Amino acid sequence: MSAPRIWLAQALLFFLTTESIGQLLEPCGYIYPEFPVVQRGSNFTAICVLKEACLQHYYVNASYIVWKTNHAAVPREQVTVINRTTSSVTFTDVVLPSVQLTCNILSFGQIEQNVYGVTMLSGFPPDKPTNLTCIVNEGKNMLCQWDPGRETYLETNYTLKSEWATEKFPDCQSKHGTSCMVSYMPTYYVNIEVWVEAENALGKVSSESINFDPVDKVKPTPPYNLSVTNSEELSSILKLSWVSSGLGGLLDLKSDIQYRTKDASTWIQVPLEDTMSPRTSFTVQDLKPFTEYVFRIRSIKDSGKGYWSDWSEEASGTTYEDRPSRPPSFWYKTNPSHGQEYRSVRLIWKALPLSEANGKILDYEVILTQSKSVSQTYTVTGTELTVNLTNDRYVASLAARNKVGKSAAAVLTIPSPHVTAAYSVVNLKAFPKDNLLWVEWTPPPKPVSKYILEWCVLSENAPCVEDWQQEDATVNRTHLRGRLLESKCYQITVTPVFATGPGGSESLKAYLKQAAPARGPTVRTKKVGKNEAVLAWDQIPVDDQNGFIRNYSISYRTSVGKEMVVHVDSSHTEYTLSSLSSDTLYMVRMAAYTDEGGKDGPEFTFTTPKFAQGEIEAIVVPVCLAFLLTTLLGVLFCFNKRDLIKKHIWPNVPDPSKSHIAQWSPHTPPRHNFNSKDQMYSDGNFTDVSVVEIEANNKKPCPDDLKSVDLFKKEKVSTEGHSSGIGGSSCMSSSRPSISSNEENESAQSTASTVQYSTVVHSGYRHQVPSVQVFSRSESTQPLLDSEERPEDLQLVDSVDGGDEILPRQPYFKQNCSQPEACPEISHFERSNQVLSGNEEDFVRLKQQQVSDHISQPYGSEQRRLFQEGSTADALGTGADGQMERFESVGMETTIDEEIPKSYLPQTVRQGGYMPQ
């Protein structure tokens, strides 16, 4: 901290620590030391002494003193009360450069009152200055420099002192602490003693003194007017000239000369022994022809004492031209040709650099020799020549020419296209190093004339533009000297060239510097199965690879599952994901990696099928085969059992349409024009019709074994035929003898004769009152007859005076019960009521159907016997009384006499039997 700032801070503290009642008063106390400076790392103790007047005014003592550093209270452990007026504070290992230390007292209700304050500084004492040196600049005062040592962190004064043996020179106060220039001109050839003194608040120290002659510390002024000239006789020399002062000739100086080419950064030193003697000119030799050089020069006392002058200003010059030092690099390319006898050959060469051209190249001379006697010469100003050559062997030579002369010829053998190259380099490698692309190889066993290196950028969007360079036969490692780009793939080819022609070529790919791919691969599914998927992708275009693709990574996951990653070699373009779940959506992302990083491609999704390929077929085909086999077995079984099946499903039912019963009804006109006696009864049978009046009596219950309708018991006793089951139930078809007025027919009729049909006519025909028809359910599967399908054809004609009555035709009607035992649960009375409630047409139809059934399906001998026995047992005699008794025996009520229909029973008997009445 500077002195003005310290005094300002102290003045501020003074005003803060004095009481003011219209005037300034003395402070209450003081701090000792008042200006403390402490060496860093040491201990320091400060003392605060209170005045007696302050003690009495504020009613305090030393125990009320509070120490603060930078407005922070000092811990009580560091404070010591010496007596009632004195308190001390101790600091250990002081490290802060500056500390504001104040002494305060607590008065009037613990109010802090500042008493006094000081600024405590810390630092180091000055080190002893070292390395004291002095330089006498030509024409200027002497400048001395030294090393002050470590930083003191305090204000330190450095003073340069000098004296002769008998005289002291004025001191030089250093402003920077490291150097000082004296205010007087030194005297040469008289020794002077010089030293440095350093002083601050913590101490004072002096350097070692040096004693010297100022002339030995002289630093000359730089040479000037430096010029460079060349020589036409010698293209490898340049002449230099300059001017140096040397204290106006009082000093002998030697020179130091350096040079470099214009584009170089490194200077070349001229040997010092060549310039030991004082001079103002010099000739530099062994330079390259037609090359621009830059020179500089400096001087020093010839004895070597003192200091080198600063470098002079640079000067440049160009050597004279010379013939080219070496032939150009020479190579050829064969262009595609449509002819078979000639070929197009493009001869190419590199322009010589200035260091080898030794001048300006005017043109190139190309000589093509097919044989020793045949040659062609071409003069070309460019760097290529295209010629048409035969398929013979040629030798081409190339020479560059400037105004001084021609270079040596470069010879290249162009073999016949039928010759095959035999040798090539081996172990070809390429690698980047120091921002250069290096190529290394092993030479072939045959001696080589030179090597040709070719390279180009591989791209799918642009053609491969080749660049090339030539290397000597002794080289097997070099770097490509073209302008190479990063992240580009270069195809490098090395071809050895022999005296007989070029050998085999070897190629490889390399990058100057790789990077991450510009884009990732696009993956797709080639085949998706139930538990696996074949992924396929295309190679990334070489323009987007930016390096060698080392491997691929495939990341796949489900919508809720964990992501799985697999790594695939870069040579593959397909990969099979296995252990997948069926009927699941998968998200796939693929990345390609080079040596410098990777790049992800777009995300792709696919769904695995629920069933594997062929799995459905494996299920469906056996099921279909099993079904087919079952069907075939069923068909075979049905075929073998067709008779049994037909019996249960399609039984043989008589065709009612072929029945002629309807034509035998006396009340129904025949629907067919035929003679009944001639056609149906050719044997003389005829119809015997009987009219029977039936009286109902229900006083007696029906026996349990009687299940037939009572009306049907009134059939003729003499008949032996059986009622057919057609058109009526089995209960109603029980065989009963009929009542006939002619009793002689009963004995005359044989047991073999049968009733062909019978017709029951209700008594309602007398009253001409039609009744509601009653139908029973039929089990027949045959189609209905015309009269059944069209009931409107049915007619019921009654005559009041007993005229003819036309009844409807019902050739066939079959009920559920086919045997008497089939209806045991229905009472005889209920069945009788059902019959009585029907109209005349119902009974006519029932009997017609019974007769038809008898005609189509006659009973067996046993059935006829049982029927005859039942008929005989039920017969009760003839006459009206007999009729009444038979009716009562079946339980019919006599009170319904008017409701019981009369039976008109036509019967068919053979000749000599019962005749119709």
Swiss-Prot record:
Low complexity compositional bias, start-end: 729-753
Signal peptide limits: 1-22
Extracellular topology ranges: 23-617
Motif (Box 1 motif): 649-657
Region Disordered: start-end pairs: 658-678, 719-754, 898-917
Short sequence motif named WSXWS motif, residue ranges: 308-312
Compartments reported by the entry: Cell membrane
Tissue expression notes: Expression not restricted to IL6-responsive cells. Found in tissues such as brain, heart, thymus, spleen, kidney, lung and liver. Found in all the cell lines tested except BaF-B03. Expressed paraventricular nucleus of the hypothalamus.
Disulphide bridges, residue numbers: C28-C54, C48-C103, C134-C144, C172-C180, C456-C464
The keyword Disulfide bond appears for this protein: yes
Fibronectin type-III domain ranges (all copies): 128-221, 222-322, 327-417, 422-515, 517-611
Domain of life per record: Eukaryota
Modified-residue entries (Phosphoserine), positions: S659, S665, S780, S787, S827, S837
GO molecular function: ciliary neurotrophic factor receptor binding; coreceptor activity; identical protein binding; interleukin-27 receptor activity; interleukin-6 binding; interleukin-6 receptor activity; interleukin-6 receptor binding; leukemia inhibitory factor receptor activity
Family listed: Belongs to the type I cytokine receptor family. Type 2 subfamily.
Protein name: Interleukin-6 receptor subunit beta
Gene name linked to the record: Il6st
